[in-house]
Amino acid sequence: MLGSRAVMLMLLLLLLPWTSQGRAVPEGSSPAWAQGQQLSQQLCTLAWTAHLPMGHVDLPREEGDDETTSEVPHIQCGDGCDPQGLRDNSQSCLQRIHQGLVFYEKLLGSDIFTGEPSLHPDGSVGQLHASLLGLRQLLQPEGHHWETEQTPSPSPSQPWQRLLLRLKILRSLQAFVAVAARVFAHGAATLSQ
């Protein structure tokens, strides 16, 4: 009986290096949960306070899965962003958040936002873009690259489409960063070393 326990212990010890090499955060470090919490809260605040020049507009709820909503990243149950998933292996969740940030970074840099002269780079959308970039860079340290799904570049939009597209993008970004902020708040409270 003692021999089988020793064999099991040796097998576990042999497996440890292999599991740690699959992490998205480099070996020997953990995500900067507190910094991620701060950046994600700032991003969340900016997403909710980004004012576009046309004032407040209520968008009707859309039914179905059209082309603009099918590509939008969502943090889902299988992404490991729940408390147990974060405790076991936070990398799946952090990679999903990173993918979403890349997606929204491309949208905020597209002609949907840059094609409007009244949206200055130092305005609220520019600040939102810079904050999003800061959080994305925190999740992907220099010299460390995650395999990401190919994020399609947005196709050029017509001027008449941009107002509605901006509103839809900001609405989905608000939902995405709200979940990401909760993930980082939980990580900062329970997983920081």
From Swiss-Prot:
Among Pfam families, the record links this protein to: IL23 (PF16649)
Family membership:
Belongs to the IL-6 superfamily.
What quaternary arrangement does the UniProt entry report? Heterodimer with IL12B; disulfide-linked. The heterodimer is known as interleukin IL-23. Interacts with IL23R; this interaction enables recruitment of IL12RB1.
Q: What does this protein do?
A: Associates with IL12B to form the pro-inflammatory cytokine IL-23 that plays different roles in innate and adaptive immunity. Released by antigen-presenting cells such as dendritic cells or macrophages, binds to a heterodimeric receptor complex composed of IL12RB1 and IL23R to activate JAK2 and TYK2 which then phosphorylate the receptor to form a docking site leading to the phosphorylation of STAT3 and STAT4. This process leads to activation of several pathways including p38 MAPK or NF-kappa-B and promotes the production of pro-inflammatory cytokines such as interleukin-17A/IL17A.
What keywords sit in the KW lines? Antiviral defense, Cytokine, Disulfide bond, Immunity, Inflammatory response, Innate immunity, Secreted, Signal, Tissue remodeling
Asked if the keyword Cell membrane belongs to this entry, the reply reads no
Which biological process terms from the Gene Ontology are attached to this UniProt entry? cell surface receptor signaling pathway via JAK-STAT; defense response to Gram-negative bacterium; defense response to virus; inflammatory response; innate immune response; negative regulation of interleukin-10 production; positive regulation of activated T cell proliferation; positive regulation of defense response to virus by host
Q: Which residues form the signal peptide?
A: 1-22
The GO terms this record gives for MF are: cytokine activity; interleukin-23 receptor binding
UniProt entry tagged with the keyword Kinase: no
InterPro entries in UniProt: 4_helix_cytokine-like_core, IL-23_alpha
GO-annotated cellular components: interleukin-23 complex
Q: What gene name is listed for this protein?
A: IL23A
Indicate where this protein resides in the cell: Secreted
Q: What is the protein name given in its UniProt record?
A: Interleukin-23 subunit alpha
What organism does the record attribute this protein to? Sus scrofa
